[in-house]
C-alpha cells in the first residue's frame, strides 16, 4: 500500500507528504504482524524505514508523533491542531515554550498550518508571528480560484512581509521566562551576526504595557540599541530597559541591533 501510494504521489509531482497520528504506530501490543518485532518502537522503526524507502526524496512532516527516533523526517509538528484565533496562537506558543530545543533534532519545528480566515488583524499578525518564531510556516487557507477574496487579500497583507518571513529560517525562539504560572508571552532569539529578535504576544482582550530589562534578553544593559518593530515599521532606541505596548489580541516583534 505504501509503495502504491508513493508511486501515485510521485506521478502527481508531489514533493511534500504529511504523516499524521504517527504515535499510533509506536503503541505497545501483545504481538505484531512481523514476529521479529517485540516492542512498539521497533514496530515504529520498521514502518518508518519503509516510509523512508518510498518517500525519502520528499519533504516529510510528522504530526502527533514520537519525538524520537527523529532521523526519518525533516520536520515535526510541535503540538496538535492550531487554527486562527488567539487561543490557537497561545496553544502553539505553550508548546514552543517547552519544545523549542527540538529544532536541534529536526530541521524544522512545525507550528501547524497558518490560517487567516475569520480572524482579526491582530490575530492574523500573532498567528503568523507564532509560526516564524517556531521556525517555519505553511499557509493553510484556500487560495484556489473559488477561495475567499478576503483571505487572498489577507495573505498579501500578512504573508508577504519580507522582514517577518526572513525570521523563519528553522531556528526557534526560546521563552524569556519559561516556568511561570501562565502561558509564556515573550520569546527571544540571538543570531550569530549579533542581531536579536524579541516578540511579545498579548493573549488578553485589553492593551498590555510592560517593561523588560535588556539584560533579561541577553543584551548588554549599558549599550544603546536600535529597534525596529517589524509589523509597523516603527523605529526606536532603548538602553537598560525596553518599554513595550501591545494592543489587545495582537503581537509586536522587534529586530534589535547595536
What are these language model-derived features?
Residues 1, 23, 27-41:
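The substrate-binding groove and active-site-proximal loops of carbohydrate-active enzymes
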Residues 131-134, 139, 178-219:
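Carbohydrate-binding surface patches
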Amino acid at each position: 500500500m505504501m509503495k502504491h501510494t508513493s508511486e501515485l504521489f510521485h506521478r502527481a509531482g508531489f514533493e511534500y507528504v504529511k504523516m499524521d497520528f504517527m504515535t499510533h504506530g509506536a503503541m505497545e501490543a501483545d504481538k505484531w504482524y512481523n514476529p521479529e518485532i517485540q516492542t512498539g518502537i521497533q514496530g515504529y522503526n520498521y514502518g518508518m524505514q519503509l516510509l523512508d524507502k518510498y518517500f525519502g526524496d520528499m519533504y516529510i512532516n510528522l504530526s502527533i508523533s514520537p519525538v524520537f527516533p527523529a532521523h526519518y523526517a525533516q520536520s515535526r509538528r510541535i503540538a496538535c491542531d492550531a487554527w486562527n484565533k488567539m487561543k490557537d496562537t497561545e496553544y502553539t506558543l505553550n508548546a514552543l515554550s517547552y519544545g523549542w530545543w527540538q529544532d536541534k533534532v529536526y530541521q524544522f519545528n512545525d507550528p501547524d498550518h497558518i490560517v487567516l480566515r475569520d480572524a482579526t488583524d491582530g490575530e492574523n499578525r500573532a498567528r503568523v508571528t507564532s509560526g516564524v518564531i517556531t521556525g517555519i510556516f505553511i499557509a493553510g487557507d484556500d487560495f484556489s480560484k473559488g477561495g475567499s477574496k478576503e483571505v487572498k487579500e489577507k495573505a498579501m497583507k500578512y504573508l508577504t512581509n519580507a522582514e517577518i518571513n526572513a525570521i523563519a529560517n528553522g531556528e526557534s525562539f526560546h521563552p524569556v521566562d519559561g516556568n511561570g504560572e501562565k502561558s509564556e508571552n515573550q520569546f527571544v532569539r540571538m543570531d550569530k551576526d549579533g542581531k536579536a529578535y524579541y516578540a511579545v504576544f498579548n493573549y488578553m482582550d485589553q492593551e498590555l504595557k510592560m517593561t523588560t530589562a535588556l539584560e533579561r534578553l541577553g543584551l548588554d544593559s549599558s549599550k544603546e540599541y536600535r529597534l525596529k518593530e517589524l509589523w509597523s515599521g516603527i523605529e526606536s532606541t532603548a538602553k537598560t530597559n525596553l518599554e513595550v505596548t501591545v494592543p489587545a489580541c495582537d503581537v509586536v516583534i522587534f529586530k534589535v541591533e547595536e
